[in-house]
Design a protein with these regions (language model features):
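Membrane-cytosol interface segments of multi-pass membrane proteins
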Residues: 1-189, 320-367
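Aromatic-anchored segments of alpha-helical transmembrane domains
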Residues: 16-23, 132-139, 183-196, 245-258, ...
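Hydrophobic alpha-helical segments of polytopic membrane proteins
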Residues: 170-184, 226-249
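Alpha-helical transmembrane segments of multi-pass integral membrane proteins
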Residues: 217, 244-353
Length: 367
């Protein structure tokens, strides 16, 4: 089964949206929009564009939910393909996942420690040990957002990988619809417990306890199974506009779920799904054009490196350009994201090459 380019494009769009959001949130943290001006057509148009920019920019963190969905999708797809080719040895599977995740994660720590143009907002202390292990959910208030807040995602991801054999077995046994129902039920129950009868630090719901984000991950796994059953039908819905329109219609309702404790149980799943429909719909449009498709697909292929390294850079720069007008920020944003994408790509590609080289040295030579 060949790699789906539109999945890589979607990952590229998602990580760029996340990086842009962190840049925007730092730059505009204390910013105030000018008063609306509806005095004439030109002023009204400018006011509308300004409000739309502000609202859409503030939704960038929803793209993290898109990453969770696409992670479930790609992991299910690759593991199912391996199962069809002769079964799965879970020991080597775990080792492959470990070597895929941890080396680049450690390189991101090294980059944080030695790179210039980095926002270092906390001291480097003994908490870095738990961070290097990925166990940022231990003493969650002190460790989950330590040094680089984006690394919380890694702590959640390793939990999903730990339980993935159980998820995979369940999904294959009960089918996509029942699996999605079970995943949503478990995730919503966990969120209910941590929000209502036994209120805990919100970082557990964010991803410190991965089951709270299982609905998105299960949706991705179910989408992978549905795609295998009927790829043409699913791609028509997701890539040819129908899914984009559906997401656009449902998004306002999803945003209303922020306005209540019980509603908040469902908000991450709802906003992540709507954002996924928008991003994948845009990816479908981009995939019609060869050069942009290759460019965004390349960013998506190496999105892991960009995700792990971008935030301290955009915070550093964002703090220094707060007096720049919005149009100046947007002009600065484009080359900044391009440079960070290239840097993340270089780091991830180099790390993977080094790991593969070291592993090949340990393999016995054929007789």
């Amino acid at each position: 089964m060949k790699r789906l380019l539109w999945i890589d494009i979607s990952k590229g769009l998602a990580i760029l949206f996340v990086a842009y959001f962190h840049f925007f949130a730092t730059y505009f943290q204390h910013g105030v929009l000018p008063p609306p001006d509806w005095s004439n057509l030109a002023a009204g148009t400018l006011t509308t564009l300004r409000l739309a920019w502000f609202k859409i920019s503030g939704l960038g963190f929803h793209a993290v939910g898109v990453f969770i969905i696409l992670s479930g999708w790609t992991l299910m797809q690759s593991t199912a393909r391996r199962a069809e080719n002769g079964g799965i040895a879970w020991g080597p599977w775990y080792w492959a996942r470990f070597m895929r995740l941890y080396p680049m994660y450690w390189v991101a720590h090294l980059v944080y420690l030695v790179s210039p143009f980095i926002a270092r907002l906390e001291p480097v202390d003994d908490r870095i040990i738990l961070s290097l292990l990925g166990l940022r959910f231990i003493d969650i208030e002190m460790n989950f957002m330590y040094l680089n807040a984006a690394w919380w995602y890694f702590a959640m991801l390793i939990q999903f990988y730990l339980i993935f054999p159980l998820l995979f077995w369940t999904a294959r046994r009960v089918g996509p619809w029942w699996f999605l129902f079970i995943g949503c039920a478990a995730g919503f129950l966990a969120r209910y417990v941590l929000l209502v009868p036994w209120p805990q630090n919100g970082l557990w719901v964010l991803g410190g306890f991965a089951i709270c984000r299982l609905p998105e991950f299960a949706l991705g796994m179910s989408l992978a199974m549905w795609h295998k059953q009927s790829p043409a039908r699913q791609e028509w819905f997701l890539l040819r506009g129908a899914g984009f329109v559906a997401g656009l219609i449902l998004y306002p309702a999803a945003l209303q779920l922020y306005h209540g404790l019980y509603e908040y149980i469902f908000v991450d799943f709802a906003t992540g799904t709507c954002c996924m429909l928008e991003i994948v719909g845009i990816a479908g449009f981009i995939s019609l054009f060869d050069s942009p498709a290759k460019l965004f697909g390349l960013v998506g292929l190496y999105s892991y490196g960009l995700y792990l390294t971008h935030q301290p850079y955009v915070i550093w720069l964002g703090l220094r350009i707060r007096e720049v007008p919005v149009w100046g920020f947007l002009l600065i944003c484009i080359p900044t994201l391009a440079v960070l994408s290239a840097w993340g790509m270089l780091l991830e590609k180099g790390t993977n090459a080094l790991v593969n080289k070291l592993l090949s040295l340990k393999r016995p030579a054929p007789a």
